[in-house]
Amino acid sequence: MSKRITRVLFKISGESLSTDSGNRIDEVRLSRLVSELRAVRNSDIETALVIGGGNILRGLAQQKELQINRVSADQMGMLATLINGMAVADALKADDIPCLLTSTLSCPQLADLYTPQKSEEALSQGKVLICTTGAGSPYLTTDTGAALRACELKADILLKATMHVDGVYDKDPLMFTDAVKYDRISYKDFVAQGLGVMDVSAVSLCMDSNIPIRVFSFVKHSLEQAIFDENIGTLICGDA
């Protein structure tokens, strides 16, 4: 990528805040995220963050288990992202990092209602923008919500941090030892092949706005590396 990056949007999974030992929001992992967001902000890059809620509840996965309907399950998942967002916002403020916590659902006692205008203003003021509750509608994932925010805010790149893989593969590398990783793949090829890791709808949205996506491992790499090191993860873009 030759274009200078000045505004990024990170999609961070809720799992990145939790541990295998059962801590839904782990102090060490939260501290790491705050430290890395500070590093990105200190590089004079406007920083937005969309966070998932899988460490607390996975709406679709737990729908049958909890015997609730799909809409309610998805709405519960949205609220889980708000809980994570509140934790991140308070941790940022405790470290003297200005931020704006937003929600696509109206929760005035907890977060500002998301609007592109208010979010643009926060970014231009150097605040870390935290976007919660996904796209604000059931049946749409936080990946799609992240793509929508990236398009609305005209982000230079969408960076998806994953906990299980280090990029896009031709098949699931956790199941197939011969899976081949792509260093770079076009939007159209990704959609045509129906590859995993990123929702096809999210990729299609970014394709329409020509916003590149980098999928990378948050276990192996930092947020800052994902911006500046073109050799990590997989870049999904207009040409391969």
Curated annotation (Swiss-Prot):
It is found in: Cytoplasm. ATP binds at residues 11-14, 54, 58, 162, 169, 172. It catalyses: UMP + ATP = UDP + ADP. The keyword Nucleotide-binding applies. GO terms for molecular function: ATP binding; UMP kinase activity. UMP binds at residues 53, 74, 135-142. This is Uridylate kinase. Belongs to the UMP kinase family. Homohexamer. InterPro entries: AceGlu_kinase-like_sf (IPR036393), Asp/Glu/Uridylate_kinase (IPR001048), Uridylate_kinase (IPR011817), Uridylate_kinase_bac (IPR015963). Pfam families: AA_kinase. It comes from Chlamydia caviae (strain ATCC VR-813 / DSM 19441 / 03DC25 / GPIC) (Chlamydophila caviae). One of its GO terms (biological process) is UDP biosynthetic process. Its EC number is 2.7.4.22. Catalyzes the reversible phosphorylation of UMP to UDP. GO terms for cellular component: cytoplasm. Inhibited by UTP. Keywords: ATP-binding, Cytoplasm, Kinase, Nucleotide-binding, Pyrimidine biosynthesis, Transferase. Pathway: Pyrimidine metabolism; CTP biosynthesis via de novo pathway; UDP from UMP (UMPK route): step 1/1. The lineage of its organism: Bacteria, Pseudomonadati, Chlamydiota, Chlamydiia, Chlamydiales. HAMAP family: PyrH_B.
